[in-house]
Structure formats: structure tokens, C-alpha cells
Amino acid sequence: MYIVAISLLSHTIWIQGVFFLFGLALGVISAFKIFTKTLAQKNEVIRNLEHDKAILQMSLDARRNQEQLIEEFSHKLTSVSQAFARDIKTESQEFFSEKTQAIHSVLAPMHNTLSVFKQNLENFETKQAEDRGALREQLSQLLTAEKKLERETQALTNILKHPGSRGRWGEIQLERILEISGMLKYCDYSVQTVDANDSSSRADIVIRLPQNRSLVIDAKTPFSEEYLTDSHADPTDLVKKIKDHIKTLKTKSYWDKFDQSPEFVILFLPGESLFNDAIRCAPELMDYAGQSNVILSSPVTLMALLKTVTYVWKQENLQNQIREIGQLGKDLYQRMHKLFDHFHKVGKHLGQAVHSYNDMSSSLSARVLPILRTFDKLEISSSHNKIEGLSQISTLPHSPKVPCQEPPLSECFSHQDTSSSDPLS
């Protein structure tokens, strides 16, 4: 039983062993399959990982290349930026320097102009202040002068109320105009001249004219006290007094009592207002005076007439100088003619002297000089200087010639019209 049991046990153990081995084999097979599958999966995973690794490596390489490119680009960008910044800075500095210079060149004249304008403005303000001060001073002086003039006018009005004072005032005005015209008392004119044949004919002023002629001027102050004090006075009385005085001058006939005097006399009215009022009241007054050989004259017209007389005197003096120059020209021509005669005589004698010198030189050279040179050959002379021959003079004096056939100077002046014409004709 025991053996059977052992056999059964052995058989059981063997079966169990077989089953164990079979199970183990199945397990090994399963495990191998699982391992194989797992290995395949692992290999797949490894391949995937290697692929991913390759991709990652490529990405990493690309990234590294990108980083390197970025770094290189960054360096290049930095260098380019720095160079660009330097160029921009240089160009901007040059640009701003040029623009600054241009602005300075534009603003410099403006600055100078503004400086000059400021200086001129300051000078103008200073001068304006000085002018205002001077103007105030002049206004003060003007007021003082106006007051003084008012007093003197009143005094003159009081003086001119008397007929004798009015006449003297007219004569003084006439003499002042003569002085302003450049005439000298007792030289160009005389005062209160009396005719030698008629002591009652006393002319206020007698103007000297060329060729011993005379021009008579009579001063008249024909206004009344009413005309002097009243600005609205009727000038009819003034015209009446002027006409009465014209009749008096016509009666005196000064042009017959002074030698070579023009056939008229000048009636001087010592005021433009007198002349204008008289002509305005009586326009025919000038014709009325002309018919009586009287010429009415105001201060302005008389001054123009005196300037004409001065011009006539200048022309007379010019003609006298021309006559004197003509006489001097004649004398100079005669003296130069005599001087040229002396020149001709001197030239003639010089020519004769040259011919005589040449004849003597020829005679000495032909007759005396050969003998003297013989003495030189005999060594008799103690001097070592040899006698030189005499040279001929070939240049003869030339007589002065007249450059052109002009008429003699005396004839030029002889044709000059030295006759003096009448300055008032």
C-alpha cells in the first residue's frame, strides 16, 4: 500500500512535475511572448525615442544654429547700429554745424542791423530829448522875441505916425535893400544927391551905372495914420497920395538934371503890402506912372533891378578886362616878335661860328697836326699824352619855326569888339 501510495505519490509528483514543467513551459512561453512583445514594444519605443531624439537633435541643432545666427545677427546689428549711430551723429553734427553757421550768417546781419538800429534809436531818443529841450528854449526865446517885437512894433507905429519919421523909415528900408544887393555907399550909389544946377532937386538915391550914367530912386511912404492903425482902412487915400507923388516926380524931371540918366525915375514903396494894396485898389496905377516916366517898385522888384545893375557892372568890368587882355596880348606879341628876331640873329651868328670852327679845325688837322705828330715819333715831347685830332661839328643851330600859319595875335585882338554898349538900351 505504501508502495502504491509512493507510486501514486511519485506519479502524482511526476504529473505535477509534468504539469509544472508544462505550466512552466507555458509560463516561459507566455513570458517569452510577453517579453518578446514587450521587447518589440520597447524597441518600438526606443525607435520612437530615437526618432524623437533625432528630431529633437535636429531641432536642437537648428536652435543652436538659430541662436548662433541670432547672436551673429545681434553682433552685426550692434556693429551696424553703432556705425549707423556714428554716421548719424557725424552727419547730424555736420548738418547742425552747417545749419548753425548758416543761421549765424543769416542772423549776424540782422543782429548788426538791430544793434545799429538800437544805437540809432538811442541816439534819436537822446537827440529828440535834446531837440525838445532846444525847442522849449527856442519857444521861450520866441515868446520873448514876440513880446519884444510887439513892443517895438508899437513903438514903430507911434514913430510912423509922424510924416517925417515915415519918410526917414522909407529911406532906411531903401538903403537896407541896397546893402543886401551888395552895393556900397558912396561907391555904387550916393544918398541925398543934389543937382549942381538946381539945389532944390534932391534925389534920395542915385545909382551909378557904367559909362558915367545914373539911375534915380525916390523913396515914398504914402500912408496915413489911419492906414497904419486900421487893418481894414480904405486904400483909396493911399492911391491918391501915390498919384500926387508921381505928379511931383514928373515935375522934378530928374532925368534932365543928372547927366546921362535914363528918362525915368523909380518910385520905391517900402513895403509889399503898400504896393499890393495900391495895385489892387487901382490896377491902372502902373500905366499912370509909366506915362509920367515913373516906375513903381516894391522891395522885391527893386532888389531884382539892383541885381540886374550888379550884373551890368560885372559885364562892364569883364569888357574892361577883355580890353586890357587884348592890349597885353598886343604887347606880348610885339615883344615875342622882337625876341624871335634876336633868336634868328643868335642862330645866324652860331652858324657862322660853327663854319669858322670847322675851317680852323680842318686847317689845324691838315697843316699843324702832322708836324706835331712828327715830334711824337722823335720822342721829344716829355708828355706821354698824344695830341688827338680835332673833330668837326656837323650839327648847326635851327631857327625856331611857327607850328601853324595862324593869324598874328595882334590881329586876333584887333578884331575884338572893345566898344561898350549901353547896358540899359
From Swiss-Prot:
Record's protein name: DNA recombination protein RmuC homolog
Biological process (GO), any one: DNA recombination
Segments forming a coiled coil: 37-66, 127-162
Top-level taxonomic group: Bacteria
Chain segments carrying region Disordered: 392-425
Family label: Belongs to the RmuC family.
Species this protein is from: Chlamydia muridarum (strain MoPn / Nigg)
InterPro entries: DNA_recombination_RmuC
